[in-house]
Amino acid sequence: MSIEVVEVRPHELHYGVYVVRFEDGTERLATRNLTPGRRVYGERLIKWEGVEYREWNPYRSKLAAAILNGLKLVPIREGTHMLYLGAASGTTPSHISDIVGERGLIYSVEFSPRVFREFMEKLVDQGRRNVIPILGDARFPYQYAHYIKGVDVVYIDVAQPAQAKILADNADYFLKPGGYVMLVIKAMSIDVTAPATETFKQEINTLKERGFDVLETVHLEPYDTAHAMVIARK
């Protein structure tokens, strides 16, 4: 038996993000579905006052986890142009696609051909025209530079060492002046022997050395262990 929705309201801080309240008192994040009737990863579809929303699962999306853990700055609006490194099968990019809308663009880079095909099937083939898929290696931005114009935000979520360096290298190519970067630090992908907090500091220092002002850092427990989200600007 489904639980009835009693309210959908805009998030008090974040554009394009909504809070759904159910009759049992629980609340969930959601975004307004850009492609009504279609799911991306099995998420619940919620209809309220003639509008369809997609539940945003923080255990499947590190951006949702960061928002629930108190992230104050999400530099994504309607019309934002973004480079997303490590698009995987498209869970978080799909919600960003909802937020940026038809005037926005998400250049989505994924390295694995198998995962890239899944991304295509779940997002591009389902009518998300604001998503530009790129099969490529985020370590080598020159390989896909001819596909991308300047972007407002560079977002990275890759299981590689030197995550901050990869982000900064891409920002040098594509980030507009005054633009933002969003770094998901996966500590265990960088150094399994070091405490996660030390790895976070190391990656943040790399951003600072590359000329970024670090604005906010949020740890992602309990949704993801040894992960953090960093927002910075150049």
From Swiss-Prot:
InterPro entries: Fibrillarin, Fibrillarin_CS, SAM-dependent_MTases_sf. Belongs to the methyltransferase superfamily. Fibrillarin family. Its EC number is 2.1.1.-. Interacts with nop5. Component of box C/D small ribonucleoprotein (sRNP) particles that contain rpl7ae, FlpA and nop5, plus a guide RNA. The keyword Transmembrane helix does not apply. Gene3D superfamilies: Phosphorylase Kinase, domain 1 (3.30.200.20), Vaccinia Virus protein VP39 (3.40.50.150). GO terms for biological process: box C/D sno(s)RNA 3'-end processing; tRNA processing. This is Fibrillarin-like rRNA/tRNA 2'-O-methyltransferase. S-adenosyl-L-methionine binds at T91, T92, E110, F111, D137, A138, D157, V158, A159, Q160. SUPFAM superfamilies: S-adenosyl-L-methionine-dependent methyltransferases (SSF53335). It comes from Pyrobaculum calidifontis (strain DSM 21063 / JCM 11548 / VA1). It is an enzyme of class 2 (transferase).
